[in-house]
Amino acid sequence: EVIYYVDETAKAIADPEVKKAFLNDILSESDLNSQGIREAIFDYLYAMPEKEMVAKIIAGVRKEDIKEFEAKSLSDLVTDDYPFYMDPMPNLYFTRDPGACIGNGLNLHHMSTPARRRELLQYMYNYNKDFAPEGSQLWYDYNGPHSIEGGDVLVLNKETVAIGLSQRTTASGIEYFASNVLKNSTFKRVIVFRIPEKRAFMHLDTVFTMVDYDKFTIHPEIEGPLQLFEVTMGADGQLNYKSVTDELSHLLAKVLNVPAVDL
């Protein structure tokens, strides 16, 4: 089933008070330095039906959209050629990054760069029960301080999650996620792939992808320098960490319980 951000967010903010809170949160995350402009944008957007408002937030609010507003500061009077008051949301081109569905729960990711931290998923999780039914777990909270992005998260089976330690996903973020998911789900281990921190290898899914239950594509440049770690939950409720010395193909075959895998 394909679902659409605009539709599901609009459902989540159907209540007028939730709509106000959502809009205030989005404006607070949009780096608006002028109270006068902020108030004008709030009034402009709040007057729209929910679906239209969400679509406009995603597309960005241009200066030409706000015809008049009351100047309340020097910054209100200073003009430049930049076309937007509120920038478009680049995350919506890469929808696997802001969140991930993992077992019976969801990650709402704290993105690595500020431009990508204006999110819609938090409201969908909190207020849209078609999207996140009662009992859905939250493994990773968007408000956490450590970055994880969804391109680094790969569910291998009901017991194993792979995650990239990369340019955009931190070790601290992985620890926070692993602590939650291993305590409260069927997952028994998190396999950490440390990949080179450069833009060409930005996420795990740019260099390693599962295409069948026992088949994977892998970028040849990461096979040599690849470091692997396994994170499990101890009987005392504390995380255990170990370096993996097995070859990747052997490790994958073992955790997937298959005779062999094709890379």
Residue ranges and their predicted role:
Residues 1-263:
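The feature marks the mature, well-folded catalytic cores of soluble enzymes
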